[in-house]
Amino acid sequence: MNLRDKIAEYPNFPKKGILFRDFSPILKDPSAMESIADEFSKYFHPKNIDIFAGIESRGFILACILATRYNKGMMMIRKAGKLPGKTTKISYTIEYGKDTIEIQKDIIEEGQRVLICDDLLATGGTAKAAAKLIEKVGGKIVGFAFIIELTDLNGMKGISKYDCKSLVKY
């Protein structure tokens, strides 16, 4: 299946000069979601993954699709202040300032192997911070799974030490 055909494009969203690539049409097509799971299954072996981590918020969707396929658990990486209970946080630099993400403290056991999922890789800042956060609590990064990669923004550069797979590149 050509997933590129399923990705909608919205010029000047969320602001002028941005071309927003949206994978939402994939979600209404069960065969497209199945195709995504099939493609990542060729690349990441289930025996090498203990839990999937979804980056807020669209990464949750991909992580759930893959966790269901692999019969594994899923955890959420969220913006600060969005998770109940004790959390571990990390701050990182973004284009115009700082941002903070967090995970629940007890969600990962020491040594668990984690595949981090997100819909899109742009600059790689959030992805890199997510890896550092998981490693901070003792998780081992198996790699990254992205539906879309914006290659001009060189996001892979910051996470190149990890095994990374993106399905559609622009």
Curated annotation (Swiss-Prot):
Spans traversing the lipid bilayer:
none
Keywords assigned by UniProt, alphabetized: Cytoplasm, Glycosyltransferase, Purine salvage, Transferase
Q: Does the keyword Glycosyltransferase apply?
A: yes
- Entry's Gene Ontology BP terms: adenine salvage; AMP salvage; purine ribonucleoside salvage
InterPro entries under this entry? Ade_phspho_trans, PRibTrfase_dom, PRTase-like, UPRTase/APRTase
Q: Secretion signal: which residues?
A: none
The subunit field of the Swiss-Prot or TrEMBL record says:
Homodimer.
Family affiliation: Belongs to the purine/pyrimidine phosphoribosyltransferase family.
Q: What is this protein called?
A: Adenine phosphoribosyltransferase
